[in-house]
Amino acid sequence: MNASGDELAPDVRAILEAARERPGGETRVSVDARSFPEAVAETEAAGRVPVIAEVKPTSPTTEGVREDDPVELAREMVAGGATALSVLTEPEHFGGSAESLRRIREAVDVPVLRKDFIMNEAQLDVVQSDLVLLIARFVGEDLPALVEAARDRGFQPLVEVHTREELTAALAAGADIVGINNRDLGKLEVDLGTFEELAPEAPEDVLLVAESGVQTVDDARRMREAGADALLVGTAIMDGDVRQNTETLTQ
């Protein structure tokens, strides 16, 4: 299930190569995590759409760099109704950092997802967060061990998948929060139909997150109708007034 370099877009290949060389933390972390499932339930009880708003200064699929203080962006997203935040810690291609995540988590009271390309157990120890992203395509057979290692530290692992094979592997590894990525990392193309195709394959007790491609309220509604418990949204929130954009998608 590990992706070979030939299967990946050049930008993704470069990200993955850098991730393999990135050092881990010096000491094992222990996390007292804020519950993401509880946050989702509270948002739905309030009649709003659960959105994980992403603090993403830049990316290979966007133009330019947003120079705003990431903490201020995060606060505006929470003020706009974000259920949780996703914070990039990948430095070279997304402009993220572990320090930004630390500052953001101290400044807000919602769950925070660390979004990075984690390849080994030591990389879990770089920084505390409430959730941690594990990409099934990249970690392959190491997924069960990484899910267990993340939980042992107190993290809530969010396992990202794009295919039926990856979804099967995620469920076999015990994942109870699964992100279905509508973006094909081989071509960087987005198809909301990916979520619609895979979501029915997941058990009802698995919390499903629709990732990538949600640009409008209609997109959000489409993903919710297909079974998304929450939406992870980056560009559509970062492009413009982040508070207003978050409010629009969470209504």
Swiss-Prot record:
GO molecular function, one term: phosphoribosylanthranilate isomerase activity
NCBIfam families assigned to the protein according to its UniProt record, in alphabetical order: Indglycph_syn_Halo_TrpC (NF041303)
Pathway the protein takes part in: Amino-acid biosynthesis; L-tryptophan biosynthesis; L-tryptophan from chorismate: step 4/5
One Pfam short name: IGPS
One GO term (biological process): L-tryptophan biosynthetic process
InterPro entries in the cross-refs: Aldolase_TIM, Indglycph_syn_Halo_TrpC, Indole-3-glycerol_P_synth, Indole-3-glycerol_P_synth_dom, Indole-3-GlycerolPSynthase_CS, RibuloseP-bd_barrel
EC number(s) from the headed UniProt entry: 4.1.1.48
KW Lyase (keyword) present: yes
Organism of this sequence: Haloferax volcanii (strain ATCC 29605 / DSM 3757 / JCM 8879 / NBRC 14742 / NCIMB 2012 / VKM B-1768 / DS2) (Halobacterium volcanii)
Protein name: Indole-3-glycerol phosphate synthase
Keywords of this entry: Amino-acid biosynthesis, Aromatic amino acid biosynthesis, Decarboxylase, Lyase, Tryptophan biosynthesis
Gene name, Swiss-Prot/TrEMBL: trpC
Family per record: Belongs to the TrpC family.
Database matches in PANTHER family: INDOLE-3-GLYCEROL-PHOSPHATE SYNTHASE, TRYPTOPHAN BIOSYNTHESIS PROTEIN
Record carries keyword ATP-binding: no
Reaction equation(s) it catalyzes: 1-(2-carboxyphenylamino)-1-deoxy-D-ribulose 5-phosphate + H(+) = (1S,2R)-1-C-(indol-3-yl)glycerol 3-phosphate + CO2 + H2O
